[in-house]
Amino acid sequence: MTGGSWDEAYRQNNVPWDIGRPQPAILRVAEWGGLVEPVLDSGCGSGEHALLAASMGLEVKGVDVSQEAIERARAKARQRGLSAEFIVGDVLALDRIPRLEPPFRTVVDIGCFHTFANADRPVYASSLAAMTDTGAVLHLLCFSEHTPGTDGPRRVTQGEITSTFSRDWEVESIEPETFAVSNLWSGPTPSAWLARIVRRCRGSSAVPRR
């Protein structure tokens, strides 16, 4: 989907992933100290996970291709009196967004990775690598292949996560989780994978381009 397509989904409120609160899986990550500033929320949508970090007093920036989603995130930040910067941009080319100012120590991806075509996955992994240094942690939550049906985003296997992040990253763990959705979702609660992925020593290779 293009930025305009995501904008239209938000305008029509056809956004079952937007539950008005953080995903429970990421709340647990935050509770055990898994969010360390500065934090990057990649594909932040309407901002709930960036705002979770902000509510903990952490420096955080969120990026999304949808102008509509970013406007909603900014409005939430104002309403809640929280400090978080939200930027319209392409997460496949994060190094082209000057306002990001890497490196980030934590990246969260909540429902972004599972929207990509196969060819975009390694581009995304390299885009995130360009924003981080050795030891940074990516927390990734995506639909798993155990979610029945074909509605919604692509289903992702553990092997696909591991292969995508085999360069510049090390997958430390992949745990079964669920992906909370709104009542716009007609099926059972989606099954998900929660991966903890650590940045390896920075290499000298260029970021792959589409």
Regions found by a protein language model. Give the residues of each.
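Short catalytic micro-motifs in class I SAM-dependent methyltransferases
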Residues: 111, 115
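A conserved beta-strand element that flanks and buttresses the S-adenosyl-L-methionine
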Residues: 108
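Class I (Rossmann-like) S-adenosyl-L-methionine-dependent methyltransferase catalytic domain
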Residues: 1-40, 46-102, 116-131, 136-210
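Conserved acidic residues
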Residues: 105
